[in-house]
A protein has these predicted regions:
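Extended substrate/RNA-proximal surfaces in nucleic-acid metabolism proteins
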Residues: 1-144, 212
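Charged catalytic cores and adjacent phosphate/nucleic-acid-binding surfaces used
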Residues: 1-25, 29, 115-133, 137-222
Length: 222
């Protein structure tokens, strides 16, 4: 089953949307993914080079840094941490100080705007996929954001995830029943398929039942 995850911005919240079982060659998802990957990579490079300018890390060029990373369509802070560990600049165990410095980049230098919920969901659905509201924490239910995303075309929801509280999981399950949503699970960067190729994967897995998987494959809810 094909899969991809995007980060959208809505009402001050960052909401992740996962696309499942889509046609990975469809122009809608290819063009959208390329646009997002290019934007994220440029943003990551800007934040990385800003850390160098502020003296937070040694002057290692961007090109040298990424040469130590697994080849990927885009680069994020996880890849910076991964490469700096290999280069002996900062151990993976001490990565918090790198992540803090990364977030302190001058906002005026950052021009990439996270994709909208509408554009993200449309790209996934146009490619024949299921648009899943990923790891919806309690605030997304309390603020009505989950309902808004469903109204925008989201037709799936993660009901099992390491970041979800017991209440959030119950709310997700109830939403799945009420709105006939496909159910999925996820581990993000904690599983063997993490952004760094599993090099620092935490063995935690949160999936779904075989029936829930087949429901997606068979498009039982349309």
């Amino acid at each position: 089953m094909s899969g991809v995850e995007f980060c959208t911005k809505y009402q001050g919240e960052e909401i992740h949307v996962t696309g499942l079982d889509f046609d990975p060659t469809h122009p809608a998802i290819v063009n959208f993914s390329n646009m997002v990957c290019e934007g994220y990579t440029e943003r990551t490079r800007t934040q990385y080079e800003d850390m160098i300018e502020r003296g937070c890390i040694p002057n290692i060029t961007w090109e040298e840094l990424v040469s130590y990373c697994p080849k990927t369509p885009f680069y994020c802070i996880d890849h910076i941490v991964y490469a700096l560990d290999i280069l002996g600049v900062c151990s993976f165990a001490d990565q918090d100080k790198i992540r803090i410095a990364y977030r302190q980049c001058d906002p005026s230098k950052l021009h990439f705007v996270r994709p909208s919920a509408d554009d993200t969901i449309k790209a996934i659905r146009d490619a024949g996929g299921v648009a899943v509201i990923a790891h919806p924490h309690e605030a997304l239910f309390d603020k009505g954001i989950v309902k808004d995303y469903i109204a925008k075309g989201a037709n799936g929801i993660e009901i099992n995830h390491s970041e979800l509280t017991e209440r959030a999981e119950k709310l997700a399950c109830h939403a799945a029943i009420e709105y006939n949503l496909y159910c999925s699970g996820g581990t993000d960067h904690t599983g063997a398929m993490s952004a760094c190729g599993g090099a620092y994967a935490i063995p935690v897995y949160h999936g779904v039942t075989e029936d829930e998987y087949r429901a997606i494959k068979e498009r039982r809810f349309g």
